[in-house]
Amino acid sequence: MRWPPWSSKTQEPTIADDKQQNCTSLLPVTTNQTDKAAILDWAAFTELRTLIPTLILTTAILSAARFHRSYLRRFPDAPSIDAAYFRRRSIYGKVTSVGDGDNFRIFHTPGGRLAGWELLPWKRIPKGKKELRDNTIHVRLAGIDAPELAHFGRPEQPYAREAHEWLTSYLLSRRVRAYLHRPDQYQRVVATVYVRRVLDFPIPFRRRDVSYEMLRRGLATVYEAKSGAEFGGDAIEAKYRNAEWWAKLKGNGMWKGFRRNKEFESPREYKTRVGLEEKK
């Protein structure tokens, strides 16, 4: 019986209705309802307001990864250098040691100071031999042969020490750019190397070809091996030979009085002679 008696049917208590709603909420969702919800969820991913930011973010991540791999990836030593770099790319780094008159080691610093090298705490260049071990690239200067220092029981050539001392003073602790030609059999990279110096008269910061500078000072000869010679092009080879010719004419370095010295021996002749003697 309704109470009060004058109340309408629409004003009846809804206890039964509430029970029915509660039971309905406990029933499992039908397949049609699930499919409909899934369709609604996927539709959100196809909207422009979702697609455009996602596309921008993905492109940015992939571009950053490619840029890092191409320009900011550091090579710890010569064997680790990607083959795609040879004859196409260069590396930038700081010279940590000079082993001979025509080879030295650099710590690869891709991007240089712009990438934070020697500015950020986690991009410091090691100084100790232990930290630098297996962490530097061994570079062989392209296109030249310097007199040999005494090693492996072999005697020292005339002007070997002068060539080594000059190269050390010219490059040690300086930043250089090496244009890579190829690896050699001694786990080095043959490269044309350039350096910029602040106190370079008459033009400061002028880019200098290290091999060329050694040739014109008479501290090296043009590389004369029958195979494996690397110059970086015919124009550079001609430039090197011209520099050697003038050094001979002026009597610079090792060429001083070489015409009168019957015992004069070029670095290539020295290596050939010593190699034949060791085979005996």
Curated annotation (Swiss-Prot):
Its main location: mitochondrion. GO terms for cellular component: membrane; mitochondrion. The chain crosses the membrane at residues 50-67. Gene3D superfamilies: 2.40.50.90. The keyword Metal-binding applies. Residues 89-257 form the TNase-like domain. Keywords: Calcium, Endonuclease, Hydrolase, Membrane, Metal-binding, Mitochondrion, Nuclease, Transmembrane, Transmembrane helix. One of its GO terms (molecular function) is endonuclease activity. Ca(2+) binds at D145. The active site is at R140, E148, R188. SUPFAM superfamilies: Staphylococcal nuclease. Its EC number is 3.1.-.-. InterPro entries: SNase_OB-fold_sf (IPR035437), Staphylococal_nuclease_OB-fold (IPR016071). It is found in: Mitochondrion; Membrane. It is a single-pass membrane protein. Belongs to the LCL3 family. This is Probable endonuclease lcl3. It comes from Emericella nidulans (strain FGSC A4 / ATCC 38163 / CBS 112.46 / NRRL 194 / M139).
